[in-house]
């Protein structure tokens, strides 16, 4: 899987360790759900003001959020499993407020890298069709997130 990362903010120091966490989590999710190696993911690192604008435009919420996901395609499980030579499966875009991630990491008492990894896992699962609209969906999604975090050694 190819993961493209763009840091669009300069309020928080974006480190090589953070970049590696994003790549590790993206690859762990891809492996767990058996995504084709031809899959592409885009991750944009932004600040609170940028994600607040997106949150207002796309969700009608006039406040900064931690992560937003924009699926490129709504694929069925069978379509995600297809590995056609030369065909690229563009999963979509994840936008993360690094400013929000750092503040949440302080609030929750863990590292910024762990919070960033969790937000990438959460965003990717949304791109793959998982949601948390009811308790059953929420429990499934949380279980997958914790398995991913365990796999990349970023447990709580």
Swiss-Prot record:
Amino acids binding Zn(2+): 122, 126, 132
GO molecular function: metalloendopeptidase activity; RNA endonuclease activity; zinc ion binding
Cofactor, how bound (note): Binds 1 zinc ion.
InterPro entries from the UniProt entry: MetalPrtase_cat_dom_sf_prd (IPR023091), YbeY (IPR002036), YbeY_CS (IPR020549)
Tagged with keyword Zinc: yes
EC annotation from Swiss-Prot or TrEMBL: 3.1.-.-
Required cofactor names: Zn(2+)
Zinc is among the record's keywords: yes
Superkingdom of source: Bacteria
Cell compartment(s), UniProt: Cytoplasm
Pfam families named among the record's database cross-references: YbeY
Recorded family membership: Belongs to the endoribonuclease YbeY family.
Function: Single strand-specific metallo-endoribonuclease involved in late-stage 70S ribosome quality control and in maturation of the 3' terminus of the 16S rRNA.
Record protein name field: Endoribonuclease YbeY
